[in-house]
Amino acid sequence: MAMKWEYRVVYVDPRGRISSEGVEFVRQSGENRTAFMGRYLDTLGNDGWEVVGIHPLIRSESSYTILKRPKVEAEA
């Protein structure tokens, strides 16, 4: 049987705010964007998520990050 995946799309805006699935995450005071994104990705990685792609939106200086993890089938 083929592996099944679930996906998550994360939007990162030019100010470094992150939104995913209707929830917005904001940097801590004084935290740079790179450290903030790393901290966010570490949290998702601990939950089994893996980055599989980044789609930059050049004109708006923002991006979409696509993650996936194995889908857990519900027991019947």
List PLM regions with ranges:
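Terminus-proximal functional modules
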Residues: M1-A76
